[in-house]
């Protein structure tokens, strides 16, 4: 199992979509939400994802295809 930390930034068109639910359900990725901020027109979430390396790669590719910006987090998001 591989664990990674990422920040997901959602465009307005995806704010109401169950993106994280689909990530967990469709890709069997374990997530841990560390911090988030969601407004009517913008949202982001910092989270840890854990799964097999190829599963994480597929999940991240799917997020990007949907229009989610995926940025790696190098340090702990809880400070």
Named regions from a protein language model:
Residues 1-79:
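Long, contiguous binding/interaction regions
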């Amino acid at each position: 199992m591989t664990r990674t930390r990422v920040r997901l930034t959602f465009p307005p068109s995806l704010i109401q979509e169950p993106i994280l639910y689909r990530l967990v359900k469709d890709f069997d990725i374990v997530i841990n939400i560390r911090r988030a901020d969601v407004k009517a027109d913008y949202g982001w979430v910092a989270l840890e994802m854990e799964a097999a390396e190829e599963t994480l790669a597929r999940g991240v590719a799917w997020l990007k295809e949907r229009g989610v910006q995926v940025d790696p987090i190098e340090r702990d998001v809880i400070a």
